[in-house]
Amino acid sequence: MARFMAYNQNPQMLALCITVAVMFLGVRSELSQDIKGCQDAMSDLYSCLPFVTNKAKAPDSTCCSTLKVKIDKGQTRKCLCTLVKDRDDPGLGFKVDANRAMSLPSACHVPANISQCPDLLHLLPDSPASQIFKQFTESSSQTVGHKAVSTSSSIKGRDNKQFGLMMAGALSIWYIM
């Protein structure tokens, strides 16, 4: 009761709490939206997780046979792209190796064009997430083996959104006070 009265007597504190809550809900809902349509496809590709999380040297036969059957059906191709795009999101519950996830189709001898991922995910051509797919496509067309895709120095799209939300919250607080 005392806490409620404190918020009631201090509208700036109430505004701050609401702003922070909205910011965190907005950031969390992006992963939920991305993964929402992928539940079936991801459960189909569960056997591929050891490979894309760098726990197995090669995808197993179950992974590859499932990928061959499912890649052109439903959301599987888009979900594989989403897995790469959201690879660093703690909400996934596991760490995805972007190079391994993008090389999964070729490791299973399944035709899939990773360069189509930015279009499938409706990414802006110059966005950091789009650049991951572009770098991988360029490196795999220039060499027989796959080079590592550098992501540590780039600012990810999700980080940009979170930074924008934090700035909006800070400006709101500054304006109220």
From Swiss-Prot:
Question: Which N-terminal stretch is annotated as signal sequence?
Answer: 1-29
| SUPFAM superfamilies documented for this protein | Bifunctional inhibitor/lipid-transfer protein/seed storage 2S albumin
The answer to whether the entry has keyword Acyltransferase is no
Q: Which residues are reported to be glycosylated?
A: N113
Localization, per the record, is: Cell membrane
Residues with lipidation of kind GPI-anchor amidated serine: S152
Q: Which Pfam families match?
A: LTP_2
Quick one: a GO cellular component term? plasma membrane
Keywords attached to this Swiss-Prot or TrEMBL record, sorted alphabetically, are: Cell membrane, Disulfide bond, Glycoprotein, GPI-anchor, Lipoprotein, Membrane, Signal
UniProt KW Ribonucleoprotein keyword? no
Q: What does this protein do?
A: Probable lipid transfer protein.
Name of the protein in question? Non-specific lipid transfer protein GPI-anchored 22
Q: Which organism is it from?
A: Arabidopsis thaliana
